[in-house]
Amino acid sequence: GLPFVGTGWYRLRFEVPERNEGRRCTLLFDGAMSHARVYVNGQEAIRWPNGYNSFHTDITPLLNPGGENLLAVRLENLPESSRWYPGAGIYRNVHLIVTDEAHVPVWGTQIITRRADEASARVRQCTALTVPQGKSPADYAIETAVTDPAGRIVARHRQSAGADFGDHCFEQEFTIDRPALWSPDTPALYTSTSEIYEGGELKDRYVTVFGIRTVEAVQGEGFRLNGKPLKFRGVCLHHDLGPLGGIVNESAIRHRIRLLKEMGCNAIRTSHNMPAPELIEICDETGMMVMAESFDEWETKKVENGYHKEFGQWAERDLVNLVRRFRNNPSVVMWCIGNEVPDQWNGDRGPKLSLRLQNICHREDPTRPVTQGMDAPDAVTANNMAAVMDIPGFNYRPHLYARNYLRLPQEMILGSETASTISSRGIYKFPVVRRSMPRYDDHQASSYDVEHCGWSNLPEDDFIQHDDRPYCMGEFVWTGFDYLGEPTPYYSDWPSHSSLFGIIDLAGIPKDRYWLYRSKWNSEAETLHILPHWNWKGREGEVTPVFIYTNYPEAELFINGRSQGRRRKDTGVTIDNSADSVSAADLKRQRRYRLMWMDTRYEPGTVKAVAYDEEGNAVAEREIRTAGEPYRIVLEADRTVIAADGKDYAFVTVRVEDRQGTPCPLADNEIRFEVTGAGYYRAGANGNPASLEPFQRPRMKLFSGMMTAVIAPTERPGTITVKATSPGLKKATVEIRSEAATQP
């Protein structure tokens, strides 16, 4: 990945008004990497080892009203503390929250959908209240108004604290007629605004965004959302944003979620840590379900300075903060307490720790099921570690699902981590055969999507499980995007620096595998994708297989106008008649989900696919062709209007075409960027897992004919002009307009 070990200090001087009496000041960190120690005027306010978690502290007693104050934050990343690139420093946002002494504390509301259908919903809100010393809760009242997605008030309730004001918590219930239920297809969000009064004086206003929906795991049936069965079409995501590193950025997250939604993905697993609040809020808005994960280690180490050193003292506090932070977010549909923890082999210790952590989740949030990703299915069914979970999650080894299902009282299995197929965008290896842990001199993997790791498999090995086994609840593929670090199977081999697992590469450009998943997961959009590219000088006359990924059942392939035959997806392939090693080597399961012409021979020209529907009607076609010499650069911005706020990035896809407009798949020209006007070049990436070109430098080589440039606005509205040049190529320019940012 990138260097991350070391110690850093942040210091901020600020003034506090002299008349600060009766006010409370709280610092909220969304995440600080890692081992944070926070000091105010030389006194330690709080420490928090976990670099991913949110934490907060009241700094009022440490302030110097009417004078200068010094906030200092010390962070330290230890060597051998992470299995992937964690980032470093204050990489998430920090908030100063100023309230009256009587106020709703941080994460002080909990909104639960007690029941919901299309006719009505019953919603309960619990609102905590912190009162000044010497005051009685009975002196206060709460008034809450609930507004629907259109901003209309649909419920209102006023309540005074009574003698039974347990734990300083107001409980209010609302009936909402004809509610808009939250789901991946209808991500409707409601807003609760609670006002705290002392007599007639407003003391605090607290806003909570929530969704009306129910979730449940039903024995023998699986997961239900709003009472309806649902299977997960999910991906695992590490938190880094490729060339931007670990720093959180809303526009980059939105860009990623948009690509995943278009693929048909409906869920994300935040592997293997607490997520950024921005990710969860965007998932709320866009209808992306979330498995919110906590730990990669419990008591037993994976790396020398990992979380196992903090688990005993900090696990409950970390888990409580995770749940309280996100318990009102409708996108979060389950909690995940661990990933492949070695404790699963430690006798009865694994089951006991599982139950302890799950019970903490249930105590803090009784509405969501709890899972964990276990990669030793035989062991965890034998020692009952899987049996104690609300939802047993298995990482890999789908061939062991059937026998372990018989030992599970829940009668369901979640593919909590699947596939780990490896590929490099635009790179193809011959001959086309299934390979485990292949290693090539160029440190790449084949985009024919037939290569995987020693513990993993190909996408269809999971597809067929979830299609043919009713007890399978769906899957979370490793991974949605390539990420910094873990370049398996090359491990520490120089110059490998990023993973090959992603369905989408580090530059945010879809690999061929994207279209395979899209053909399976997105039934609303047409998919018809041909691979490989058709520039194979030197392979004339040699066998060069052609694959088609499509959601149509049949297609015909033409090379230079000559039919290579029609292929139909083989629905006669089942999980039971394709489980042997001969079938695996023969790509038998792949025939059910992709169309393959294994004996086609290369000749320059055109490759065309014609797709047919179930009735045999030709309904779509696509053509690729052999490209000529690179001629011009093409720039395409994902958006042409962005906010002038310094952080609303535009993502510009860069490619090279020949004179006829055909993309050049082998182009590796170095592209130089010049950005003028109201913006600047923020970063770039080409998706090459073995490239050490700096992300921030405004020049980079194309990889397989493409790259992405990230353009940032200043805080001054205006026009941003991006110019790309390369010797011997026709230059390209794109303009992006940045407009004054609107205040929330």
Protein language model annotation of sequence segments:
Residues Q125-L129, T193-E195, V546-T550, V610-A611, ...:
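Beta-strand-rich structural segments
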Residues P137-E143, D185-Y190, N551, L557-R568, ...:
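Short flexible loop/turn segments that cap and initiate beta-strands
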Residues V146-A155, R567-K569, T574-D576, P630-L635, ...:
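Short aromatic-acidic-glycine turn motif
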